[in-house]
Amino acid sequence: KGGVGKTSLCSAIVRELVEAFPGKRILAIDADPAVGLSTALGVHVEHTIDDIRNEVVQTSERGEYRQAIEVLNEARFRIFDTMVECDGFAFLAIGRPEAAGCYCSVNSYLKEVISMLANDFDYVVIDGEAGIEQISRRVMEQVSHLVLVTDQSAKGVNVCREIKEAADDLITYERIGMIVNRVVDPSMNDLVKLDGVDVLAYIPTDPIHAANDIHGKSVFELPEDSNIMVGVHQALHNLGIF
């Protein structure tokens, strides 16, 4: 569910991969319309995937169909231009649709983008939106590792259960696990469980990370022994990535 620290953990995963596998091609995709991953990673974004989609839509609406087809045919090259090359990884933002209402057209485009780019990178880390929308629309049809994030609340675990049930029916994944983030009372950890899903890590509330957020600092400025970095390292180890 929203507010459990999903984007913060995703940025920490990117950092862990960058530091553990120098020289590997790593792509971070911000697929959440809340667009927070760029800030967490310290990336400045000028253009998004939705900018390209909007150009196709607008040229079509103006009746300029030949130009719209040309833009569509050039999409692969335009997408690479949209990527931000950072120190050790590339970053791609899907963007927030300008029009109010359904986000499904962007999700459909995102599905094609992920399929197109996956083979060009050794690791692709996707920060999806909260809830089951992108799973239900099969935005990520095939993933190696599906990481669910919750806090200690029953509501958070219920959302994770819904995501797993949807994933079991609609997509293909090799490994699944759950991170319990923002743990306030460790004595309650045994109550946070989901059938068929291993808990990868219990991560206590992290005051250092909270201070980082207040000052607008990126995940790369966190000390290695901060709760979030220690927890994410443990989670990746339990997933078999390390």
Give the predicted meaning of each segment.
Residues 18-86:
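N-terminal phosphate/diphosphate-binding loop that engages ATP/GTP or pyrophosphate donors
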Residues 105-205, 211:
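Conserved catalytic-core segment of NTP-binding enzymes
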Residues 2-3:
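Walker A (P-loop) phosphate-binding loop of P-loop NTPases
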Residues 9:
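Hydrophobic positions on the alpha1 helix immediately C-terminal to the Walker A/P-loop
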Residues 70-86, 90-126:
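Cytosolic-facing regulatory segments adjacent to core modules
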Residues 12, 16, 40, 138:
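Active-site signature of alpha/beta-hydrolase-fold catalytic machinery across serine-
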Residues 6:
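Conserved lysine of the Walker
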Residues 213-226:
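C-terminal boundary of histidine-terminating zinc-finger modules
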